[in-house]
Regions:
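Short strand-connecting beta-turns/loops that link adjacent beta-strands
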Residues: 36, 65-67, 97, 122-125
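Hydrophobic ligand-binding cavity/cleft-lining segments
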Residues: 7-67, 156, 163
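Beta-strand/loop substructures that line and gate deep hydrophobic ligand-binding cavities in soluble
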Residues: 104-152, 156
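Glycine-rich portal/gate segments that line the openings of hydrophobic small-molecule binding cavities
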Residues: 61-108, 156-168
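Short, surface-exposed coil-to-beta transition loops
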Residues: 26-28, 84-89, 111-116
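Hydrophobic beta-strand positions in extracellular immunoglobulin-like domains
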Residues: 33, 76, 132-134
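Sec-dependent N-terminal signal peptides
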Residues: 1-3
């Protein structure tokens, strides 16, 4: 169970360290990336292209779009899913280029899921923040393991997004 963690690579300053706080399915992950808000937004909203790039997203398909709202089908498979492919349908609301909110429409083995991505301009780039609230449908004896594995996945996801945002 994670309360707060700061992870910095070799030579990273505290300003560029990624942070994860929260526990038991309620998390906030942040990282600073030296890119424009528009570049961060472009990467964050390449929904279908994220399949295979993000550590847990195996498939992604935009099912419908109406203005700033869209429905997205995703299949997750990662250590926190215990190797099982888990399908979910999400409703996303975009507020370009600053915020993306999402909520669960339907899903396998997920009681509830909601969250947001926020892009905030800071000196030298943007602060990317991901807030997530998830209640998995897993047996009680597996919940702590699920959350530990989810925390590791959140940190890895932030690292991957930063790497993708830094690509030309």
């Amino acid at each position: 169970m994670l309360v707060a963690s700061t992870v910095a690579g070799p030579g990273a300053s505290p300003a560029t360290a990624q942070q994860l706080s929260g526990s038991l399915g309620q998390y906030k992950a942040t990282i600073t990336v030296p890119v424009s808000p528009q570049q961060a937004w472009r990467v964050l909203t390449r929904y279908e292209a994220m399949a295979g790039l993000m550590p847990d997203i195996k498939q992604a398909k935009v099912l419908s779009r109406q203005g700033s709202q869209l429905d997205l089908a995703q299949t997750y498979q990662a250590p926190y899913t215990f190797g099982l492919p888990i399908k979910a349908r999400l409703r996303l609301v975009e507020q370009a280029p600053r915020q993306l909110s999402y909520s669960l429409i339907s899903g396998e083995r997920i009681r509830s899921l909601s969250g947001s991505w926020t892009i905030t301009p800071v000196q030298g780039g943007v602060k990317l923040e991901h807030r997530i609230a998830i209640d998995p449908e897993v047996p009680a004896f597996l919940r702590s393991t699920y959350f530990e594995l989810s925390e590791a996945n959140l940190l890895e996801s932030m690292r991957v997004l930063k790497r993708l945002m830094l690509q030309p």
